[in-house]
Design a protein with these regions (language model features):
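Short, well-ordered beta-strand micro-motif
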Residues: 38-40, 84
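N-terminal domain-onset segments
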Residues: 1-34, 43, 51, 60-67
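Extracellular interaction modules
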Residues: 31-38, 77
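Helix-rich interaction surfaces within compact, conserved domain-sized segments
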Residues: 47-85
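Helix N-cap motif at beta-to-alpha junctions
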Residues: 40-46
């Protein structure tokens, strides 16, 4: 069955998230003060670990940052950018 699941991310640093294989990331946003992304998943697929990086504006983006996911603006004015690595 295909459905949309919500996954938490932390701001700053590299994070591993377990999710069904071949999940398609749809969007990234703040919900309250927390960062999440939403993905279309096939619930019958096996689980894999995927890695994500969240960096602030002006911080170095490593060469291995493969896919840009989106940008979020915090209430305090800071801006962060999420990548899959």
């Amino acid at each position: 069955m295909q459905t949309v699941w919500k996954f938490p991310l932390q701001i700053g640093g590299v994070w591993e998230v377990e999710m069904p294989s071949h999940a398609e990331i749809l969007s990234l946003a703040l919900q309250g003060d927390d960062l999440f992304f939403w993905a279309r998943v096939e619930t019958r697929n096996g689980v894999v670990r995927r890695r994500f990086l969240v960096v602030g504006t002006g911080h170095e983006i490593p060469h291995y940052a493969e896919k840009f996911l989106g940008t979020v603006h915090l209430k305090n004015g800071l801006v962060f950018h999420a990548f899959e690595i």
